[in-house]
């Protein structure tokens, strides 16, 4: 396990000869060597991989059982110099009883043996014909490969600080899998040795089962099933190998391959520890029988320079087009239903929204339109107010008007220049002073207009600020920070853009679609400073606070995974390789940390708004933080990277 908590694991599917133990263990040794070269720390082979699963009644023959034990002993010795831990399946006798077992070994030593608990005897499965259940066995020893090892279903293993547990095939398919108890007892990785034949539709179910069990146990789950080489007398084995982590499949093998396969992934034990700390329900899991933890230190092997793990630079936005469209539809529904519920509760039939021609106010308006349609209210009850100021450009002004007209809402225009100039005179601010007061006064003037119009009309002010702005505090306190209901408060900027594009792609009106596309093409800006001489936007948000794609990346992994600055940099430098170098990543991470801590007071007073995802900053919900917390520990860690 590396300094960031990544553990490199593998599911190894070797060539196999049914009953040919020498050949089978030779192939295992070869794959173990390959795994070591790739920096793997723990690798698992299929169920009964030493003999083959489909030996049938030959499993009762002493000749095969002796051959399996001898061949396994050679495998243990052949891999003794490899810096990794291996898990292999073989039949083992204990007294007069035969068990379907998983043996854990490293450095020439067998650490322990786990018997299969659930022995299936239905459909194509006849395991009770040969094997007994190992459920409940604890505190015993078993002879294997000339060694005596711990034997039982109460075993977990800790190698270089990484604790893992084992279950075998059918163990996963029951109401309470052993892995649930092992995880509750501390195991963060579960290895499953399997020999599961293919039938139509089973693979999809298996993928869901593995993913769900990893989510339910807040663990990494490494599943390795027998492949090409098992007998096809009545069954076909496709060589399924899956590595999942907390509900997400990280890697999987090619099915029905005639080649040996080594599926490798880095699983994030540090993140799993964080998830278990924050998940109070996991901590309340049913008490488990006392587990026996077998500890072992293994010499550090080859640590691959590249992570065997996909680092998504856009964690809020699905890459797959179909899933992205489904995500946008779901988010849009949550937003609009939240607003609809608030409108119905307050008996408001009017909504007031400031429309700037930018992304956030556009999304808020689209959400309001959907909410009004859902409630059967007249869209003219939506009062879209454009409030041109000192920095408003022709482009955003035009887009604001065209969008409102295209959607059929009530359009109002209330310029703020004169009111702001009068305010500057009242407080003694020279109009040429371009300080924060100059900018914030405009934002507060706009909010005052919206609030007063809402009072006049008996309406509700719909907030437009998004999650990214809340994280950075990129809003004027008691200005655009305030509303009566903030529909975008849980939507990050990177997702806002895709939501608007999704609406544009489905828009029936060509003019409205063209307006939405032009809004998408407009630089993000608060437009609080006068435009350039050519009329273009002078104030670009991402030039001032940094790229939103970086900030959303930091925000997601800081809140959702609990990563510190060092790990955030490590991952961001890989996720954004080719677009943002290390210096850029560290610069903007420093900005993110400083602003996130210093601007909490704005979030502490934020209005109500719907939660749409697992990352949100409502002080009444997912994020509790004092407004006067110090950022020094995080900044100090960041400084050590420079």
PLM features: what roles do these ranges have?
Residues 1-354, 370-379, 411:
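Enzyme catalytic cores with a strong preference for nitrogen-chemistry domains
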Residues 24, 160, 219, 231, ...:
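ATP/NTP-dependent adenylation/nucleotidyl-transfer catalytic domains that generate, transfer
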